[in-house]
């Protein structure tokens, strides 16, 4: 087919950037595609162009993407557009799937027995439990095993050495030893996991030139979708395979890289021209999904990131709907607002960072008979260490002579005693029938500090059965020593907050325990109704999807972002922080017509405040105030002359504590002198001489020399 006919038949609706991507066939090409830009349509059209216009045999083209579902969808869409016969000759694979093919070819060619792939989840779980109990005295929970699996995947996909493994921050006990034992046991059993397929494939391609040559002869054109989610080892496999032909078409967007915990390696997109000299870098910046206000807000937000390539989202759909800011006074109000919307007939997609954020809303929906859809595959809340601790503590309060519970809990109650003293209390309680904590007080060699603390702990626990569930949780945290234990171990107390929201509906601790069991059973049996008005999803699971109305839930400081920008002290901290920004951005860009954000003074959100700061009405208000202030003040003194408008920042993040502190006198180029009254995330709240308080973006005013402190702290 000639190019003109192909263009008329398949490219008539494509914009110039999309057309340029379709016809970029030879050599290394990086296509940076913003959310909603039609990248899958372009990728499929390009495959058709390569075959029908360039005469490239479809068997010579290898298209790789992130998931099996994505490969199936791509094959289906290609077949619908260019015919099933042609689709049957194309290769669509995950990189894991390609690695399996490399291993099979190597085994046949050299008559080598390859390790057996672990395909049963139960086999892997038993193996992980076995090695965990060799290293730790604790029995691993489901969430602990998930964390260990994630860590192993990260290690293999990042190709970390022992030093790199030791540097991983984790709550797991002795991760290097766990990993060594895991690998040794795999080798002993002749097993490999899914990530090992890539590890072995890379080793083979490096060490066996005939194998590499075979695949380079089979494939001369390589297309990679979702390359921002591709790991370091996967990029190395791709580089080896495409190294001879150099015909590599990589599609991605570093602004949407949100799988760092799985070893996603967006640096490969940033370094593409360095790895592939002479490469083309193309952009697709037109967003066909979201309304202009949503696109504008998302564009302003993501532009603040440092580790990105300059690009500007452009809304095609016009003014479809607003970014809606809902003022609330508590976390609970999010839940009631969403539920009220559903009761009024609205359809909403509620997105959040962690699956547990959905539980209070699910609890309410189950009580009221409202349908919902919920992807629950990663829900480990009920087996989390903290949740199990709390349920154990509530059970122990009702059964103060239960030795099994006591031995699991005593050191979590602010009672740092040796185990022999705990065992002494167990033996004495078994003889006397008295509560364990009472017998512990009678232990002859217990320290004075513990002896003084025990009556308060015992009184706190004894009071729990007579309290509401919410009151009991507060008592556990504040009076029974458990909150201090969490702080000492630097454990996230977010699970306690979710338990508190669930407990707010229950009259007693016993009823909360019962409700947790009910919810766990309900979720295990839950079937998603197709017509449910409410969709509940993590932002990660919503990647690639879109909804008319999106609500971002629980995007508060400490959750999303996990830590504030002012707390970033190392490049690694900054990378984690910027991935949190990208996660928020991905959540925003799922919305077509309506994006709802919650603004809660009691639970600050630096990200949401930044969005509010850049909304059209806020910008217009600032411009009006600046113009009025300038009129009243007259010409600005030279030392404070504002700099010209700049592109998104290239300077390092500003530590606001170096610029100002609460109570500090400051001077602003437009508003004059004032006093800092609050620092929240990146924002300074300043009361100026005209009596007005203004919230200013710290890095912006510092970068443009708009603000100075008049004193040193």
Identify the residue ranges that each predicted region occupies.
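P-loop NTPase Walker
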Residues: 1-112, 213, 296-299
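Conserved helicase NTPase motor core
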Residues: 6-7, 12-23, 27-38, 62-63, ...
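Short glycine-/polar-rich loops that comprise or flank the Walker A/P-loop
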Residues: 27, 56-60, 87-88, 244-247, ...
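Helicase P-loop NTPase motor core
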Residues: 35-43, 47, 277-280, 285-372, ...
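ATP-hydrolysis module of ASCE/P-loop NTPase motor domains
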Residues: 87-89, 108-196, 419-420
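Conserved beta-strand -> loop -> alpha-helix junction used to position metal-binding or nucleic-acid-contacting
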Residues: 87-102, 370-393
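Conserved helicase C-terminal RecA-like lobe
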Residues: 168, 393-617
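C-terminal accessory regions
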Residues: 555-692, 696, 705, 709-713
């Amino acid at each position: 087919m000639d190019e003109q006919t192909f263009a008329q038949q398949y490219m008539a609706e494509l914009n110039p950037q999309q057309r340029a991507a379709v016809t970029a066939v030879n050599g290394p090409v990086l296509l940076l595609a913003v959310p909603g830009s039609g990248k899958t349509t372009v990728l499929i059209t390009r495959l058709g162009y390569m075959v029908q216009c360039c005469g490239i045999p479809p068997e010579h083209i290898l298209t790789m993407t992130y998931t099996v579902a994505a490969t199936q969808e791509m094959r289906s869409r290609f077949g619908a557009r260019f015919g099933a016969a042609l689709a049957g000759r194309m290769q669509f694979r995950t990189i894991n799937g390609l690695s399996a093919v490399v291993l099979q070819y190597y085994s046949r060619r050299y008559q080598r027995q390859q390790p057996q792939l672990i395909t049963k989840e139960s086999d892997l779980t038993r193996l992980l439990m076995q090695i965990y109990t060799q290293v730790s005295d604790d029995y691993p929970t489901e969430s602990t095993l998930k964390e260990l699996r994630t860590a192993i995947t990260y290690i293999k996909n990042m190709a970390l050495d022992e030093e790199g493994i030791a540097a991983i921050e984790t709550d797991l006990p002795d991760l290097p030893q766990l990993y060594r034992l895991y690998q040794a046991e795999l080798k002993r059993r002749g097993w490999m996991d899914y990530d090992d397929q890539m590890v072995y494939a890379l080793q083979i391609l490096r060490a066996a030139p005939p194998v590499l040559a075979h695949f380079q002869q089979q494939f001369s054109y390589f297309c990679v979708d979702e390359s921002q989610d591709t790991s370091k080892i996967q990029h190395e496999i791709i580089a080896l395979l495409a190294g001879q032909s150099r015909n590599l078409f990589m599609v991605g967007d570093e602004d949407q890289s949100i799988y760092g915990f799985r070893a996603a390696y967006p640096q490969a997109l940033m370094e593409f021209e360095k790895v592939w000299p002479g490469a083309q870098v193309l952009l697709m910046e037109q967003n066909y999904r979201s309304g202009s206000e949503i696109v504008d807000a998302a564009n302003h937000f993501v532009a603040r990131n440092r580790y990105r390539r300059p690009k500007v989202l452009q809304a095609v759909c016009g003014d479809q709907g607003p970014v809606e800011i809902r003022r609330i006074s508590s976390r609970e109000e999010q839940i009631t607002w969403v539920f009220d919307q559903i009761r009024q007939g609205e359809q909403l997609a509620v997105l959040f960072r962690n699956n547990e954020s959905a539980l209070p809303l699910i609890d309410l929906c189950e009580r009221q008979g409202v349908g919902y859809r919920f992807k629950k595959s990663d829900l480990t809340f009920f087996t989390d260490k903290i949740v199990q601790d709390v349920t154990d503590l509530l059970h122990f309060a009702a059964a103060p002579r239960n030795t099994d519970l006591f031995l699991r809990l005593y050191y979590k109650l602010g009672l740092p005693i040796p185990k022999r003293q705990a065992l002494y209390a167990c033996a004495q309680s078994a003889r006397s029938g008295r509560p364990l904590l009472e017998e512990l007080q009678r232990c002859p060699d217990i320290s004075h500090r513990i002896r003084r603390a025990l009556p308060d702990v015992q009184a706190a626990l004894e009071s729990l059965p007579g309290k509401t569930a919410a009151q009991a949780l507060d008592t556990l945290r504040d009076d029974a020593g458990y909150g201090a234990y969490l702080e000492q171990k630097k454990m996230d107390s977010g699970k306690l907050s979710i338990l508190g929201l669930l407990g707010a509906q229950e009259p007693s601790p016993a009823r909360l325990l019962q409700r947790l069991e009910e919810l766990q059973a309900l979720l295990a049996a839950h079937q998603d109704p197709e017509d449910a008005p409410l969709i509940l999803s993590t932002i990660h699971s919503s990647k690639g999807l879109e909804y008319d109305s999106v609500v971002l839930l629980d995007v508060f400081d400490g959750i999303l972002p996990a830590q504030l920008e002012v707390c970033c002290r190392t490049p690694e901290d900054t990378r984690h922080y910027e991935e949190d920004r990208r996660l928020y951005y991905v959540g925003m860009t799922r919305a077509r017509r309506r994006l709802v954000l919650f603004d809660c003074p009691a639970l600050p959100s630096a990200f949401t405040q930044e969005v509010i700061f850049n909304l059209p009405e806020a910008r217009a208000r600032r411009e009006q105030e600046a113009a009025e202030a300038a009129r009243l003040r007259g010409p600005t003194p030279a030392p404070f002359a504002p700099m010209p408008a700049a592109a998104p920042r290239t300077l390092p993040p500003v530590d606001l504590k170096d610029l100002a502190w609460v109570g500090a006198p400051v001077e602003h180029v437009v508003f004059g002198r004032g006093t800092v009254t609050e620092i929240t995330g990146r924002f300074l709240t300043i009361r100026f001489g005209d009596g007005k308080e203004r919230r200013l973006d710290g890095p912006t005013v510092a970068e443009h020399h708009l603000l100075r402190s008049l004193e040193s702290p």
